[in-house]
From Swiss-Prot:
Ranges that cross the membrane: none
Alphabetized SUPFAM superfamilies for the sequence: Clavaminate synthase-like
Keyword Iron belongs to the record: yes
GO terms of biological process kind: DNA damage response; intracellular iron ion homeostasis
Residues of the Fe2OG dioxygenase domain: 78-180
Residue positions binding Fe cation: H98, D100, H161
Protein name (record): PKHD-type hydroxylase blr3905
């Protein structure tokens, strides 16, 4: 399931992030790549252990965990500390086809997660750069994603994906992973669809409608059946 979420960060938040990031030191992005990914990864990152990256990452987690659509789509158990990257046209930056590591560990906190969902939060407007599309492959084909600054996309970490070469400007984003309470992507997708339908019924019929209450019970019982906590 590929899900886009609008306005995770406001435009003012994005401007503040960019001001802080532009004044920070960057390093070779291959420092956080696995052995396979490192061969095709060409970009820059904020040092993951830096105070800047941690503070900005905490702001992103706070914004996401108060976003109902994110909670409904991800059903998160653990969120890996967000990382930050930059693809510059002047350096020919891109990221070839790869799949994310199954397990990620954080050196500072000791957190280890199974990567169920990958997240990219865009921090540059689409008209600021050419190229830089996130291309995600699944059983239905390839999907190009290039969202407004402040929006994010969630997709299964099992997906092959790439970032096309940036030919003008710079693509700036945050990226990270999460472990969901619902391991299986198909099960998580069905629960999300059910939740979306229930919310639509609540808007039309109210929370006290008997059939809506029954469906809400089914929703919680499915989570109870599938959840790993």
């Amino acid at each position: 399931m590929l899900t886009c979420i609008e306005n995770v960060l406001s435009k003012d938040d994005v401007a503040d992030f960019r001001r802080i990031m532009d004044a920070s030191a960057w390093e070779d992005g291959r420092s956080t790549a696995g052995s396979q990914s490192a061969m095709v990864k060409r970009n820059e990152q904020l040092p993951p252990d830096s105070e800047v990256a941690r503070k900005l990452g905490n702001r992103i987690i706070s914004a996401l965990t108060s976003n109902p659509r994110f909670i409904a789509a991800a059903i998160p158990l653990q969120i890996f500390p967000p990382l930050f990257n930059r693809y510059a046209a002047t350096s020919g930056h891109h990221f070839g086809l790869h799949v994310d590591n199954a397990i990620r560990g954080d050196r500072l906190t000791g957190l280890r997660i199974r990567t169920d969902l990958s997240v990219t939060l865009f921090l540059a407007e689409p008209d600021e750069y050419d190229g830089g599309e996130l291309v995600i492959e699944d059983t239905y084909g390839s999907h190009e994603v290039k969202l407004p600054a402040g929006d994010c996309v969630l997709y299964p970490s099992t997906s092959l994906h790439l970032v096309t070469p940036v030919t003008r400007g710079a693509r700036v984003a945050s990226f990270f992973w999460l472990q969901s309470m619902i391991r299986d992507d198909q099960a998580r997708s069905m629960i999300f669809d059910l939740d979306t339908a229930i919310q639509a019924l609540v808007e039309r019929l109210g929370r006290d409608d008997p059939e809506t209450v029954k469906l809400t019970g089914i929703y919680h019982n499915l989570i109870r059946y599938w959840a790993e906590v």
